[in-house]
Amino acid sequence: MSLSNKLSITDLALTGKRVLIRVDFNSPIQDGKITNPARINAALPTIKYALDNGASKVILMSHLGRPDGKAISKYSLKPVASELEKLLKKPVFFLHDCVGPDIEKAVLEAPEGAVVLLENLRFHIEEEGSAKNEEGKKIKADPSKVTQFREQLTRLGDVYVNDAFGTAHRAHSSMVGIKLPRRASGFLVKKELDYFAKALENPERPFLAILGGAKVSDKIQLIENMLDKVNCLVIGGGMAFTFKKTMQNVAIGNSLFDKPGSEKVAGIVEKAKKNNVEIVFPVDYVVGDKFDANANHKIVTDDEGVPDGWMGLDVGPKSNELFREAVLKAKTILWNGPPGVFEFPAFAKGSKVLLDATVEAVQKGATVIVGGGDTATVVANHDAEEKLSHVSTGGGASLELLEGKTLPGVAELSNK
């Protein structure tokens, strides 16, 4: 799947068209009010572009939370409509459902240039294709009803725009089932695709991937795929201990050890050698006597090892220096996973040093792309989003792209 040849909203003629946009308005709500409108803000450029370019109506659809195929009022998108009205400075027509004759009629009757927000897609089991029942058992949707649901959604628009990168790895009805002739990315999805194409299809070299995370076995596909693309790999986080113990018999105390992952280590090291990829591992650690913000802590080296009863919770000063050097040598940097338990201040320094190095690299002309999830949280904690080239909005979606998988929501977009 090429990421760089998909239709974008700017390739579409929108005049007089009903523009059906899949957005990601999955926002935190407290007492009926949106507590963080970041995702709503992020969709505004696409919505405004459609309005400014002659769309007859803009119809927005989204999920919120996990209502498991039932209409549950606390998961209603109604509070989002109020927030969106404030941000757009124009009325938003909120509909009580997302499909059905009443909804089709309401969309047709909405005034010219209207913004219409449909109710939560996941109030219907047909959006995800399955749900959990009261006993927590998975139940599947009736395939004929899924087809009907998709056809009903399709009837609401003339052109389809997907601006929900965070769910692009899910083959949900609103992502893959809307068979309008022209299906394009919105600005958010386009930015994601442009940056990931830059890294995965045509990187400026040297190309460095920084990987963290707890288990080798969780990241094995990611590591394998990266070894075919990068010049250098930095491995931090809990999974570094599985490598160190397996390869060099370093004492790791009570640090994370991933037995199934350890069986993959030799193959990874062999492949790196064959592909001429340098792997940079930590050589010292900040260890704690318990997994706790208030743990006693000290620095140990590979030679000393992690004492019994202690665990490695961050990388140490020598490792910070090695990681920084690797970052400053690279021209394209992909960062997925912090090197330590950044939530605890005593074990957050490795993440901050790495962040500072990536910011410095950008200032020197490198491209830095941050995969979503924990790494994006590190960046946000230090208000550094604007200082890096791109911080992905999709944790799961960006991980699957980096693993070399096809994203269903992207594959469904029309080619140029």
Swiss-Prot record:
Cofactor(s) for this UniProt protein: Mg(2+)
Pfam families assigned to the protein according to its UniProt record, in alphabetical order: PGK
Lineage start: Eukaryota, Fungi, Dikarya, Basidiomycota, Agaricomycotina
Catalytic activity: (2R)-3-phosphoglycerate + ATP = (2R)-3-phospho-glyceroyl phosphate + ADP
Enzyme Commission designation: 2.7.2.3
Quaternary structure and interacting proteins, as annotated: Monomer.
Residues reported in the UniProt entry to bind Mg(2+): A214, D218, D374
Full protein name: Phosphoglycerate kinase
HAMAP family: Phosphoglyc_kinase
Residues holding ATP: A214, K219, G238, G312, E343, D374, T375
Compartments in which it is found: Cytoplasm; Mitochondrion
Family: Belongs to the phosphoglycerate kinase family.
